[in-house]
Structures are given as C-alpha cells and as structure tokens.
C-alpha cells in the first residue's frame, strides 16, 4: 500500500517502474496496490485494476466494507531472459467487513481466471487482512487455482510467523495477513518474513 508521492519516490530507483492506480479514483487519489518491476528484466505486456465491490470496474466500496475502497492491480509480464510470460495481481482487502473479504476472494479468483485463464503462471500477493483459517483464505485455497507459498518452500521457512504487529514495534508478530499465492508448477525456493 502506498500513496502516489511515496511510490514516485521509490520509482526514482534506477531501472524500476510501477503500475497500479489509486483506489479512490482509478488515477492518483488514495492508496495504490502498486506492482514494481525491473524494466531491464521484464516487459510489461498488459495491465489493469479492479475494485473489490459489486461494481468492480468503477471505484467503490463493496458489500459490508465501511472504510475504504479496496483495489487490485494486475500486470502481465514477459521475462526478457527466459521469455516466460506471467501475471501478477496485488490486492488489499477490507479490514472490517467479513462479507467484503469473503466476496473479495471470490472476485479475485474470478478475475484471475477471466484475465489470465487457468493455465497461466500467476502470482497473487497482498494484504488480505485475514489469517489462514479465516473464510477469505479458505475460499482462495479451496478453489485450487492458487497455492499458498508459505506451504511450498523448498527450504525451511525463516523469520517471524506473522506479518502484522498492530503497529507495535515490540510485539510478537503472530498474525499472518500478507500472502504470496502462486499457481501450480511454481517453484518456491525460500519463504521468509
């Protein structure tokens, strides 16, 4: 999550660009679920955004969300070294609405299938505001299209168990709410927080 001014600052790093729109207007306003990529390594082939709501093609809140518009930005990329094509989706789910989080998972799966199909290599990352046993994550896992990289690491996982500390720097991070989902056939060499 980042605001345009923050993202533009990061993009000043040599050789990087980003895609993604502001969640409030589909342009620059509000937080972005941006995707940064190294331009010397990857070609951007296509890109887009959708909102986690009943009207995903226009900015808005969905279902029982009360706070903010929530957005997913995606890109289709080609690796210049291998020639392989893949899709990358970056999401931020609502932090209050249970129905919104569940329906967001259903919408994410539907949009991945619509945009990338079922045989493409896909990475789906983000702040899902849900622990692995919560309904939104169970919904993603039970569909079978996406696999949680946490479970696929070839090497033992390291770092903290969780990814969220309630903004308390001295607290133990036990709640995992940020994920990297991948499609079948994706090799996960390491997993760390």
Show where each model-derived region lies:
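Solvent-exposed, acidic/flexible segments
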Residues: 1-3, 29, 68, 98-105, ...
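Divalent metal-dependent phosphoesterase catalytic cores across multiple superfamilies
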Residues: 1-16, 100-118
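Metal-dependent phosphoester-hydrolase catalytic domains
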Residues: 99, 103, 110-122, 130-193
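Loop/turn elements at helix/coil->beta-strand transitions in domains of secreted/extracellular proteins
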Residues: 13-18, 82-87, 117-122, 144-147
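Active-site metal-binding loops of divalent metal-dependent hydrolases
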Residues: 91-93, 126-128
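Structured beta-strand-rich core segments of catalytic domains in phosphoester-bond hydrolases
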Residues: 2-85, 192-193
């Amino acid at each position: 999550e980042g605001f345009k001014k923050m993202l533009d600052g990061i993009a000043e790093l040599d050789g990087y660009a980003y895609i993604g729109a502001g969640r409030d207007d589909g342009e620059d306003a509000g937080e972005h679920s941006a995707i940064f990529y190294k331009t010397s390594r990857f070609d951007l082939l296509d890109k887009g955004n959708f909102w986690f709501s009943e009207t995903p093609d226009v900015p808005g809140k969905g279902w029982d969300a009360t706070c903010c518009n929530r957005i997913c930005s995606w890109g289709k990329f080609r690796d210049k070294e291998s020639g392989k094509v893949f899709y990358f989706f970056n999401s931020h789910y609502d932090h209050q609405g249970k129905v919104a989080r569940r329906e967001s998972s259903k919408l994410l799966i539907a949009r991945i299938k619509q945009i990338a199909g079922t045989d493409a290599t896909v990475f789906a990352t983000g702040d899902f505001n849900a622990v692995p046993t919560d309904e939104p994550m169970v919904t993603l896992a039970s569909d079978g299209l996406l696999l949680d990289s946490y479970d696929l690491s070839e090497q033992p996982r390291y770092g903290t168990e969780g990814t969220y500390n309630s903004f308390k720097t001295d607290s133990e991070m036990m709640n995992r709410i940020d994920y990297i989902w991948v499609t079948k056939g994706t090799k996960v060499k390491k997993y760390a927080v």
